[in-house]
């Protein structure tokens, strides 16, 4: 595969697309599939065939169109976006193809949810068919790899990534360039690249891994994905052989001496395998439990060899950095948190879905502009960031910038981009118990502080929500939070107390009401099982 070959594929695909008078894109990502978008696509395909429009109208399944709360979503080449589409709407949609939009299904795109985003990682989402490599190439795919292999040395690639200020998008935000540099300098008989993946644009992730492997001198890669994501597994199983067939994976990649292959590893689903050393153990076929560090994976990871581990969003950020330059990327975001971040915006909010925003955007803008605010006239209470181990942030901190340092100061984390909004109907003690229940179940049990500590914290939280706790229990809960945070082996245990610590700090009156007055101010405890999110 040469640059000329790549350009020929892109030109051929663009010519093929131009032959269609009209184009209809159906979101077939997980959220819309759950709302039966596959039935919508099938109905559109049938209607096109019945009308004999196969040469005039292209119906394509695409990645997430973003506004999941309005799914199934369908977009058209003329720019219309349709919401809550059902199979029976297929005929009407085709009747309006290339004409005035179908107003009864029209979803306004002139809202902050869409125009306040800055799409870099998700630029292909909703545009290309993730299972067709030709679609990806036509959108500029693999051009960054060609540039890296043909115009840059491995050291220059690392320099560009370092210059960009990119930080790991899966957790603590470790500088990506520094991690790559450490692996590149490490001595070993072989080096590995591992991607921790649950979702993603498959060829974008593969391209990012290829560039990383070239930069650090790795010859083998693994994409680790949990079994409960069958769609992502299906798409990756289609993408890997496509890349191999075009000479983008394997030996002598793009006519160079660079060799790299990628193998897909499906995990059993343990949350703790998000921790690097636990993930490595799982890839090796062992039980997914973390080990003490040092040595770090960069020095001694998979099979004891230097190993680079990043998550999907980190790898997906690399191709545009190589294409446009590190300075371009560093110009987005804040002084210490560069670029954009993808969030899954959910909870008690009008607009739920997947958004990509510049680092430094305020929580207020996320909730009340992009998210559309709180429905049913209720009041905002808190937003929880960073997944099950994140902290709950109250209304007085809504003007906080969304970046690594600012969230850490509030006792929360960026994590992989979860953002859950809660209103006045949520009991924050019940919320803390809900997340602690998850951490307790997901603890691998290797270290006593996490294994026993999460159990004891959950026991006390259960007693509080059952109105049977004492002030001594509350004191014990605070002591346990500190103990588990500072003595657990890995990030799961170290961050498990975050929801408790943050709610104790910002919603202490709710804890006291449960213990001293035996009442739940939100009216949740004693009525429902699990958090009212």
Model-assigned labels for residue ranges:
Residues 101-163, 310-325:
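Flexible inter-domain linker/hinge segments
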Residues 29-33, 161-183, 269-281, 285-287, ...:
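Conserved phosphate/anionic-ligand binding catalytic regions in large, soluble enzymes, centered on
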Residues 233-359, 371:
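Hydrophobic alpha-helical positions that pack around
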Residues 1-22, 37-61, 78-103, 138, ...:
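Ferredoxin-type iron-sulfur electron-transfer modules in oxidoreductases and energy-metabolism complexes
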Residues 201-215:
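Histidine-anchored nucleotide/phosphate-binding helix
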